[in-house]
């Protein structure tokens, strides 16, 4: 179980075959095509044309259609364990079906746009109705604004304008003008103004002093009542069109699975087009290079031998090492740690795969913190059901829960915990004289000190393991002096300190081993430095080494703390249920409380376990910065593709 060895593959093929090559590579899913160095390209080569923009546009169109269906015709909610539908690779790559699904998406988007347009039209028509209703009593055509001798003007006054004052001002100052109040509410007063043409301007000027505003009905023809009738007809027609569009959209509600399949097909096509841009061509040939796992190379090479192409395989050079993609290989136990490692950072290609070393510690610590047979059984059964029924594409997280569930059950058996003290409390409710208790090796509540010491010992073991891995890696890379003075020196110092405390290994009262470690520390901390830098180097090495080592060890006290808190909470919920004196109520309260405790502990143990790995363990040896292996393959989010062997 280690980082998969990669080979660099360089291919030169005929341009007419490049599409078939890309499709077969996508089927095989074992080659990551590298991005070409465009600055070093000769003038005769260029990138292959790719339809990425078209794929992205279609993907957006499809996503809009799916969002519309989920909003307007939501499908039945799928169960938690409902698996993705399976589809053969041949059907998955059916271009005719893809075209039909894209037409369906376009139709859905058109209907959605029609509904939005008609909704906006309804809003506009209702707004026009609201503006015309105050003028309903006006029986004069709105296009009639003047006669031979008179001007006809409509307008509004603010609600605070006193109508009697307006009429009085007109009568006293402009007797050739007459105003009629048609409607009044809290927002406005609507009026009709009749004036002799010679005094129209003066009358309007007078009314403006009261806040008059005109022009609300400008551009309309017919009476307000006729306009309102026409608006009612338009609203009914718009509502009918909108309902027809809604029904047509609802009829397409069962197309969501087809659109989801289409989305997956487009994702695979987009990935193929993005990789097509990495191919170089001069119009006659195409050239590309990439990375392939060494174990997959024979099958890929056998297929390349059947083509009219030339290819070359080589190991990555020292200059290429930082750019080599990383793929982790593990067994059924260690691959469950992939979800943990990927959250931190992929290891460098020339680093070490942490999963085989981390897996025992992570699972052991998780089980120790949870430590309950009931919780362990729930984790085991839940993860197995999810893996079997759901068939997730990424299984590592649920596999991790499964292994942690087994260890949780084991520690629960050691501590005698089954949903806390559920069984003893239940037995006491049935028979108050009951003394039933599950057998246990130790009790988290009564053996706190022993558990704390055990946590520190386990922390020391993991920290020393990380240091040992660092020593091996440094020696393998030819950096033995670094291993000697950075890790082995501290082993000697710690061993010498322990021997001195036990009174072992001293000569004439002098702790020899401790003194040897001290000399090595003084020499190693000052190596490569001159003058006063040696002094500061020694001081920094001693301070950082002592504080760093012991603070890392102390961090493992959280193992005891999480175990204790989980056990206490479980017992508290059981105690609350037992106070009712009713078995049914006790079971309900206990199960609800323990469910909450399980959820809380799952999150807490997961986070704290990761923290121990990332900070205390990885900090000792881990070299990160790797780039995950991303081969050209068929991507799917909604369906499960059943691979078929090509002849």
Name each model feature, range by range:
Residues 2-7, 19-22, 26-33, 278, ...:
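Conserved, carboxylate-rich catalytic/transport cores that coordinate ions
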Residues 1-358, 394-398:
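Long, charged N-terminal accessory/stalk domains
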